[in-house]
């Protein structure tokens, strides 16, 4: 049987360049993706390169707090 409870958690990834541009009011929105990660294998914050429809390019999306 499996040990422990929730090892996999649902996280939200947010575009880092859109959040920086939103302060300057250049971006029309902020791109967000949801995914799941294993807490034991990746205890640090996750960063993935994903497509941002607001920037029209692939940018780094970082994990944010809920």
Curated annotation (Swiss-Prot):
A biological-process GO annotation: translation
UniProt keyword terms in alphabetical order: Chloroplast, Plastid, Ribonucleoprotein, Ribosomal protein
InterPro entries (alphabetical): Ribosomal_bL33, Ribosomal_bL33_CS, Ribosomal_bL33_sf, Ribosomal_zn-bd
GO MF entries: structural constituent of ribosome
Gene Ontology annotations for the cellular component aspect, listed alphabetically: chloroplast; ribonucleoprotein complex; ribosome
Domain of life: Eukaryota
Localization, UniProt: Plastid, Chloroplast
Keyword Ribosomal protein recorded: yes
Protein family per UniProt: Belongs to the bacterial ribosomal protein bL33 family.
Name assigned to this protein: Large ribosomal subunit protein bL33c
Gene designation: rpl33
